[in-house]
């Protein structure tokens, strides 16, 4: 079944098509029929629901997260049965609505409740309501919270008609006071936001036709996190194309230069066969050469006239941005009865862990809920460095080691990479001759770069576009394959082939000669070879990476055979051996020889070409964060990337930073990060039943939308979070504070006692799909204030990376461009989730101001002091002059300024002392001379000067 999503632009296209194809009378009848359908729908039900109404409800996003982008990117959208049952033609949903409507139509509601309520008022008068309003109306009423958000135990039962008692009257005052104060404060915040936006953009007046800037931004089609091939619609819409697009099939031009980019054009480009070779060149406001202003060409936006000369585009954009924010204040529903979390009186099994460590004053105490994990097919548990499984009530343990190194020649810092979905059908476990073998079929994964230069990990077999780049190797070779043959694509392939994860082989040979051919990889091999004198190896049948090991009781030799140079290297036991980027070591236990192969992926140069950044966390198939620690020597630790699934996390992360070894324990404690890492911890586990019968741990929640996250992005606010580690051997705790709807969450991934057959797993109450949007610092209207994605750290690290190869100005400008698109998309999404669509040019003007200054980090100069905030173009001119005269130049670093700080940095002295922090500004400038050029709008108002407002420039309009 196909559905067409209409907006104003689509309706205009429909009218034109109808008039071209049909006559006026037929077109009139079709449009009139559509009008009747709309009226019939509006009178049939009181609900005005759209699929976009669910974008702000985090727990419904999982139902259509893989399909929602197709609504905006494709002309038609096929809704499958599982999605159509949820949103559009849900039989049970319509059945409930029909029952409610039938009760109202038959006047049964008056018999049930003769006192009119708000719900009856909405239904009886056919007032359109949204889902959030309906949620407020049908929720349990009467529970009141105090100023701290705690709910009182007794609700308000009566109303003003039936009279309130003194207890209920006092409680009702809380809600009245809260509604009045919230409305007043948020309206004031919205008005103050308008004032700040106009102050920051007041100087943007189009005075130049063309600045002759040679720089453009190139956009290509890429894969988003949902697997869709997309173009950045929000950024490209309302822009002007700067290049010709050629159809490679027939050699004709699809679109030519100076074409106005619309959604229809982007959809047509997405449907082309050779779309992967298409580049869209767009002029950018940030790349304009004019100091503290923009030209008409770089504005790249057509309004009413051919030229925008004289247009006060800064004030227009600020008003266009801030006016919807005022409307968002009116969308705050003071829902006294909407509970933030569900509560019940069921019994929960609580798992307490008390950790104690000698010589460390820090004691971790954590309480989590957990559920028992049961695998029906095979009782398998994936741990950090071993696999535990239960077979015939016997616990087996198998070890494997994978070394963590650096991804070669790539930058994926702070990206969130998505792995393929875990499928148990790909796992085969065979029991043959009391030998347990664990198999996994061939999997090919890749890292691709998306629009914002971020790496995304995907399974090749599910997305057809990248079949062109698959480079199949021998089935027995595995590792990272980097394809640099085509510079247009930055693609890394993880080729993981058919292999045996663990296996026990017991060879008993009694003849003198033995021919041994092995072409598989094993994480663990046990070889017992007895009574032999000669060993014959068939070199022709061996592959490059094959190994041959034998064990001799008398001399205890470990022999590694390399077929490349046909040299047999002999080493004693328990020695590490490097040969062609492969590391092996063996271990003797109970007359068995255990061979461990440490797979090296050559992940050096992976982050900023610096070995200081060595640690990253993979949890729920996402590369989340990288920590910066100095590593002086190599420390081999256990790592498994093969079997990351949604149920378990099994990456053993150990890094070295002034560690010491005592009683075979490696201990690490960082006081500033509150990180405690131990190999063998002394911990006590207590189990008890906890009855959740306390209503005081619940909080009431308002339905607030929009304005808070907009303020946070514009002001560049940061919320610092504590991040810990907990696992079986290394404890990882994530303590994450979210801005709006989630306060304190503790994630504990794996809880397992290897001496106990019962293994437990904590089921997350906040799933990982919240973090899927890797190109934005907010998701579904909520800001992500975690250290997983800190835009300021991202800017700083990228600047340091670029500084190694280019000069300081180029590194600063490039790093600003790097975060430019992220900030634009973040703020555009905040408005689009509220069904407010504005041209991106309005936001680009503000973000250009936010990214226009730097911070001085030099100490030996007199003009500018340390931590002074100066314009980037100004300091570049000064450094150029200093360099010509062979003087030391200023050292600086990029900084993202909020709109308030940007106003203070770009305004004169009079504006600053009348804006904010008057006493601080006067005290800082009391000993220094300060020159005010009186060029900002507030200085002109103070001095009653003429304001640069009006469309002027009449000669350009006439010509």
Curated annotation (Swiss-Prot):
Its EC number is 2.7.7.6. GO terms for molecular function: DNA binding; DNA-directed RNA polymerase activity; metal ion binding. Keywords: Apicoplast, DNA-directed RNA polymerase, Metal-binding, Nucleotidyltransferase, Plastid, Transcription, Transferase, Zinc. Zn(2+) binds at residues 211, 288, 295, 298. It catalyses: RNA(n) + a ribonucleoside 5'-triphosphate = RNA(n+1) + diphosphate. Binds 1 Zn(2+) ion per subunit. CDD domains: RNAP_beta'_C. Transmembrane segments: none annotated. The keyword Cell wall biogenesis/degradation does not apply. It is found in: Plastid, Apicoplast. The keyword ATP-binding does not apply. In plastids the minimal PEP RNA polymerase catalytic core is composed of four subunits: alpha, beta, beta', and beta''. When a (nuclear-encoded) sigma factor is associated with the core the holoenzyme is formed, which can initiate transcription. DNA-dependent RNA polymerase catalyzes the transcription of DNA into RNA using the four ribonucleoside triphosphates as substrates. This is DNA-directed RNA polymerase subunit beta''. It comes from Plasmodium falciparum (isolate 3D7). The gene is rpoC2.
């Amino acid at each position: 079944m196909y559905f067409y999503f209409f907006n104003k632009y689509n309706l205009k296209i429909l009218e034109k098509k109808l008039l071209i194809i049909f006559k006026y009378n037929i077109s009139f009848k079709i449009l009139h029929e559509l009008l009747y359908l709309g009226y019939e729908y509006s009178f049939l039900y009181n609900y005005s629901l759209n699929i976009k109404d669910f974008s702000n409800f985090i727990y419904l996003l999982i139902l259509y997260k893989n399909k929602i982008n197709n609504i905006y990117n494709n002309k038609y959208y096929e809704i499958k049965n599982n999605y159509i049952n949820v949103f559009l033609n849900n039989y049970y949903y319509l059945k409930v609505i029909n029952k409610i409507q039938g009760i109202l139509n038959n006047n049964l509601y008056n018999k049930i409740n003769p006192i009119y309520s708000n719900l009856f008022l909405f239904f009886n008068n056919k007032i359109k309501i949204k889902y959030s309003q309906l949620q407020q109306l049908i929720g349990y009423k009467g529970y009141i919270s105090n100023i701290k958000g705690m709910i009182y135990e007794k609700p308000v039962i009566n109303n003003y008609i039936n009279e309130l008692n003194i207890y209920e009257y006092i409680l009702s005052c809380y809600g009245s006071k809260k509604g009045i104060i919230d409305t007043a404060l948020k309206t004031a915040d919205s008005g103050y936001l308008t004032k700040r936006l106009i102050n920051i953009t007041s100087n943007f007046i189009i005075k130049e036709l063309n600045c002759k800037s040679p720089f453009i931004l190139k956009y290509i089609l890429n894969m988003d996190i949902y697997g869709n091939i997309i173009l950045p619609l929000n950024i490209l819409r309302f822009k002007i194309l700067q290049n010709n697009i050629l159809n490679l099939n027939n050699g004709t031009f699809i679109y030519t230069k100076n074409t106005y980019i619309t959604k229809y054009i982007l959809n047509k480009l997405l449907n082309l066969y050779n779309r992967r070779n298409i580049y869209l060149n767009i002029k950018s406001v940030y790349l304009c050469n004019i100091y503290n202003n923009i030209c008409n060409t770089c504005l790249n936006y057509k309004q009413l006239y051919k030229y925008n000369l004289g247009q006060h585009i800064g004030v227009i954009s600020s008003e266009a941005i801030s006016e919807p924010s005022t409307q968002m204040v009116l969308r705050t529903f003071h829902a006294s009865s909407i509970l933030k979390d569900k509560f019940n009186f069921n019994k929960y099994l609580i798992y307490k862990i008390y950790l104690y460590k000698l010589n460390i004053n820090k004691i971790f105490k954590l309480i989590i809920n957990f559920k028992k994990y049961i695998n029906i097919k095979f009782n398998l548990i994936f741990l950090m460095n071993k696999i535990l499984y239960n077979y015939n009530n016997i616990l087996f343990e198998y070890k494997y080691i994978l070394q963590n190194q650096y991804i070669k020649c790539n930058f994926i810092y702070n990206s969130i990479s998505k792995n393929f979905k875990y499928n148990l059908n790909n796992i085969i476990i065979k029991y043959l001759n009391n030998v347990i073998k664990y198999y996994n079929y061939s999997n090919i994964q890749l890292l691709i770069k998306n629009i914002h230069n971020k790496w995304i990990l995907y399974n090749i077999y599910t997305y057809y576009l990248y079949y062109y780049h698959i480079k199949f190797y021998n089935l027995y070779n595995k590792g990272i394959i980097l394809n640099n043959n085509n510079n247009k694509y930055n693609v890394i392939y993880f080729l993981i082939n058919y292999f045996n994860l663990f296996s026990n082989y017991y060879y008993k040979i009694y003849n003198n000669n033995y021919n041994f051919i092995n072409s598989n990889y094993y994480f663990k091999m046990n070889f017992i070879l007895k009574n032999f004198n000669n060993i014959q190896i068939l070199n022709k049948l061996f592959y490059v990476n094959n190994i041959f090991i034998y064990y001799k009781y008398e001399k205890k030799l470990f022999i590694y055979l390399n077929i490349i140079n046909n040299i047999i290297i002999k080493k004693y036991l328990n020695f590490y051996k490097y040969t062609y980027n492969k590391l092996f070591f063996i271990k003797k236990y109970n007359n068995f020889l255990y061979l461990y192969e440490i797979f090296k992926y050559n992940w050096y140069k992976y982050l900023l070409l610096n070995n200081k950044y060595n640690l990253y966390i993979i949890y729920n198939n996402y590369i989340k964060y990288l920590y910066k620690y100095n590593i002086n020597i190599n420390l081999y630790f256990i790592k498994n990337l093969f079997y990351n699934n949604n149920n378990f996390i099994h990456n053993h992360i150990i890094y070295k930073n002034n560690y010491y070894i005592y009683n075979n324990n490696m201990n690490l404690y960082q006081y500033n990060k509150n990180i405690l890492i131990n190999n063998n911890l002394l911990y006590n586990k207590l189990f008890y039943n906890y009855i959740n019968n306390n209503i005081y741990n619940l909080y009431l929640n308002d339905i607030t939308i929009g304005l808070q996250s907009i303020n946070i992005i514009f002001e560049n606010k940061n919320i610092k979070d504590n991040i810990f580690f907990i696992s079986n051997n290394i404890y990882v705790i994530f303590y994450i504070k979210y801005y709006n709807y989630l306060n304190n969450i503790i994630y504990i991934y794996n809880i397992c006692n290897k001496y106990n057959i019962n293994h437990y797993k904590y089921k997350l109450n906040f799933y990982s799909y919240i973090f899927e949007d890797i190109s934005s610092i907010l998701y579904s209207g909520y800001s992500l204030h975690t250290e997983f994605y800190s835009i300021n750290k991202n800017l700083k690290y990228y600047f340091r990376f670029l500084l190694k190869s280019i000069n300081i100005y180029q590194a600063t400008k490039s790093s600003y461009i790097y975060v430019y698109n992220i900030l634009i998309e973040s703020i555009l999404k905040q408005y689009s989730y509220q069904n407010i669509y504005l041209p991106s040019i309005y936001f680009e003007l503000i973000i250009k101001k936010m990214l226009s200054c730097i911070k001085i980090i030099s100490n030996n100069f007199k003009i500018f002091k340390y931590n002074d905030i100066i314009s980037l173009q100004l300091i570049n001119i000064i450094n150029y002059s200093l360099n010509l005269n062979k003087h030391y130049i200023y050292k600086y670093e990029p900084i993202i300024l909020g709109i308030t700080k940007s106003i203070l940095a770009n305004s004169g002295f009079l504006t600053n002392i009348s804006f904010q922090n008057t006493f601080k500004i006067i005290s800082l400038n009391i000993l220094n001379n300060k020159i005010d050029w009186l060029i900002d709008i507030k200085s002109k108002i103070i001095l009653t000067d003429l304001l640069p407002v009006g469309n002027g420039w009449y000669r350009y309009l006439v010509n």
